Regions:
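Active-site bordering "gate/hinge" segments
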Residues: 2-240, 338-358
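Structured core elements
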Residues: 171, 181, 220-222, 244-246, ...
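Short, acidic Gly/Pro/Ser/Thr-rich loop/turn segments
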Residues: 189, 228-230, 289-291, 315-316
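Dual-mode signal for accessory low-complexity, basic/Gly-rich regions
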Residues: 238-239, 255-310, 316-317
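Short, small/polar residue-rich loop motifs at catalytic or cofactor-binding pockets
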Residues: 239-241, 330-331
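Active-site and channel-lining beta-strand-loop segments
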Residues: 241-256, 336-337
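Internal helix-turn-beta structural module
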Residues: 295-357
Length: 358
């Protein structure tokens, strides 16, 4: 199905808007921050705005912010393009991104849809357009994480990236039982996604991460917050039923949880392919505007601290030379974090003086 077959017409090569509905006033500050500051949308630019039914109110606020900016947007509702879960990226979505200056995706993930989202990202990276990936976004997030001062987030993220480019080890500890060390390959990049989006790096919104693919990780990671992909929506906050993960040589070797259904499903997911059990991402959360975790991965992974993910290493950004069909983040709470021997996070709070920002 093409854009024309879907019923979206163009005039003189410009994309026309399909309305997502009436924007809610309380979501507009976050929407304007996304459009004006994070994406830097300019008058006359072409924007592909993709959403699902659950995220429709968020899309409506972004649509209004784009209109206020003088941009031309194409709205695409995923449920109009085929059944969910998506087996692949719908053709009208890919076609819209092929001609857009800017792309935005707002959706709630469902099992088996990661490959469809990765197909969208491949178009974004090939064309090097500014792109916001808002997977799991809610009205609450628009009023919290999307109202952050992203220029401050960018400053902290820059300092952390500079430190980690020189670092040899990272140690993370929590009272819940997390204790692991990570080691790094100087040939792999540390990537900053601070919310100020450029053609070089697309970003989740809300933003605030500095991440790499670690050379190796050893120890215990207790996921007592949220897990990624569809696990977040299915199992929610894991504070009362933490997932205890043992890692050796950068690979998951054991998983334990009081909820045996979660334990078995997570273990199976992390053995989908030969690299699904491999730690593909280690990330700092750098969104200083967040005061608490809310049980939604999209925002909680930006909370000050360190988290990891098993599976695909985003090699197009980190330069890791391996791949996986899966990617699942795991989060923990109230981290103590040392870069080499210097403690930079204490109980989930950055020690700004240790980063030259006091």
């Amino acid at each position: 199905m093409s854009l024309a077959e879907f019923g979206i017409k163009t005039k003189s090569g410009k994309m026309e808007r399909m309305s997502f509905g009436i924007a809610r006033s309380e979501l507009m500050p976050g929407a304007k921050n996304a459009v004006d500051v994070c994406l830097g949308v300019r008058e006359g630019e072409q924007v592909a705005l993709i959403a699902d039914e659950v995220s429709r109110s968020v899309a409506a606020s972004l649509e209004q912010a784009l209109q206020d900016r003088g941009a031309q947007s194409t709205g695409l509702l995923l449920e109009d393009l085929g059944p969910r879960p998506l087996n692949g990226a719908p053709e009208p979505v890919l076609e819209a991104l092929e001609t857009a200056d800017v792309g935005v995706l707002c959706m709630t993930p469902q099992p088996g849809e990661l490959s469809a989202r990765m197909s969208i990202v491949r178009v974004v990276e090939r064309r090097q357009i500014r792109y916001a990936h808002m997977i799991g976004v809610t009205a609450e997030i628009m009023q919290q994480g999307m109202c952050t001062d992203y220029r401050l987030v960018d400053l902290l993220s820059d300092r952390l990236r500079e430190r980690m480019l020189r670092a040899e080890t990272l140690t993370v500890k929590t009272e819940a039982g997390t204790l692991f060390s990570a080691y790094f390959d100087r040939g792999l990049d540390w990537v900053k996604t601070s919310g100020l989006i450029s053609p070089r790096y697309w970003s989740n919104l809300p933003a605030g991460e500095v991440f790499t693919t670690p050379a190796s990780v050893d120890g215990t990671f207790v996921c007592d917050a949220t897990a990624g992909d569809y696990f977040n929506g299915k199992y929610g906050d894991l504070q009362k039923t933490p997932l205890v993960l043992e890692i050796s040589g950068g690979r998951l070797v054991r998983a334990e949880c009081k909820r045996k259904d979660l334990e078995e499903e997570f273990w199976s997911y992390c053995h989908t392919d030969e690299n699904s059990d491999r730690v593909g991402e280690l990330a700092f959360g750098t969104n200083l505007g967040l005061s608490r975790m809310i049980g939604i991965l999209l925002q909680d992974e930006k909370f000050p601290g360190v988290h990891i993910a098993f599976g695909d290493p985003y090699g197009s950004q980190t330069h890791a030379d391996w791949k996986s069909r899966t990617h699942v983040d795991v989060l923990t709470r109230n981290c103590d974090v040392w870069i080499d021997r210097d403690q930079v996070i204490e109980k989930g709070h950055y020690q700004m003086n240790h980063l030259g920002l006091a």
